[in-house]
Amino acid sequence: LDYIYVTQQFGVTKDSKRLYASGSHSGTDFRAIVGTPVKSVADGVVLGVGDTDLTCPYASLGKFVFIKHNNGLSSAYGHLSLIKAYQGQKIERGEVIGYSGNTGHSTGPHLHLTIYAGDGAMMTTRPSKACPGRSYTMPLAPTSAYLDPLYYLPPL
């Protein structure tokens, strides 16, 4: 995003216990009207793209892009309206990978950014808690692999 405004921070926040089963927010949310270009935070390779709404509408990330970066970190960008990247694509820092939206478990248009340590995150298929009998594939990691995105972005 070219213009940054944080709408929900990483971790335990005043709203996280009410909004998330884990009680913690897995990334940082940034205000972004639908259609705002979303850019990669660093060089890397796209490990996965998807849309959790196809399996379980209004749950999880919705349309997302998952990137493994050359610096050892990984990132996931969620609630996109349109995905412009594809699995296996080499990405440069600042390259447009999609456009912000309001897909998945979202209360309004924004970008959800998650940063993961090392090889902690991977594309994982698991049963949906929100839609019993269905499974979806998305980036997941052990709790210790989730990092605060604001520590890894340029100062706001």
Briefly describe each language-model feature range.
Residues 52, 80, 102-103, 128:
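Residue-level structural signal for beta-strand termini and adjacent loop
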Residues 86-95, 114-156:
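Acidic, glycine-rich catalytic/binding loops that coordinate metals and/or anionic ligands
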Residues 29, 66, 76, 99, ...:
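Conserved beta-strand positions that form and line the central face of beta-propeller blades
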Residues 23-26, 40-84, 108-117:
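Zn2+-dependent peptidoglycan hydrolase active-site motif and core
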Residues 6, 30, 44, 94, ...:
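Terminal peptide-recognition signature
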Residues 38-40, 44-46, 50, 88-100:
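A structural signal for short beta-strand/turn segments enriched in small hydrophobics and glycine
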Residues 5-40, 51:
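Short glycine/threonine/proline-enriched tight-turn/helix- or strand-capping micro-motif at secondary-structure
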Residues 11, 35, 51, 70-72, ...:
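Solvent-exposed coil/turn segments that connect beta secondary-structure elements
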